[in-house]
Amino acid sequence: MITIVDYGLGNIGAFLNMYKRMNVAAKAARTADELADAERIVLPGVGAFDHALELLDASGMRPLLEEKVVGDKVPVVGVCVGMQILADTSEEGQGRGLGWIPGAVRHFRSMQVPNSLPLPHMGWNDVEPLPGDAGLFRGLERDARFYFLHSFYYECADPADRVAVATYGAPFACAVRRGNVWGVQFHPEKSHHFGAMLLKNFAEL
């Protein structure tokens, strides 16, 4: 069962519809009780780093989420801001992230992206998988394209945690992984068959 954490941010319906079309069992969890039987977890998110963490805390699901991911090693993939809150800190906010993949979230201008490039980085972009993704990008090694909408990127403390890169003025990590925790900066639920393949791969990890 794929469980999508519904804490008030993200395209929950889009994930559910995509999994339904693939005949993969999926549900939304709005409470800790609904999260309890999760075998795979999708942690979506849009908006701001601090706001996402505040809503996750307010949902009452964070303690059980930590228990399942950190203690029980249940696979989880964070999407967009759901990926960013996997980090320790963000230049966008003051709060402490989940810290599941050590690193910091930086603004694109921090890596000297030319001012001629508009922000947010919005639209389709090529993605280059790297070793270590443990199958998340299976079948997507060539010609993978995903939909992005963001102004911040994930800077891993350990470069080995990067499992895919994209380029927007300069290369940046668009997917990360450590153990049973993955994060993708792009939106697989908006990325048509590329996104469907990635979400199916996650269901089969």
Where are these regions (language model features)?
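Pocket-forming structural segment of enzyme catalytic cores
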Residues: 89-168
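Beta-strand-turn-beta hairpins that frame and shape the catalytic cleft
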Residues: 143, 177-181
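Short, surface-exposed beta-strand/loop micro-motifs that present aromatic residues
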Residues: 170-177
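N-terminal beta1-alpha1 ligand-phosphate binding loop
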Residues: 2-24, 188-189
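Cysteine-nucleophile active-site neighborhood
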Residues: 47-122
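Acyltransferase
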Residues: 184-205
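An anion/phosphate-binding loop that grips the pyrophosphate of nucleotide cofactors and donors
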Residues: 38
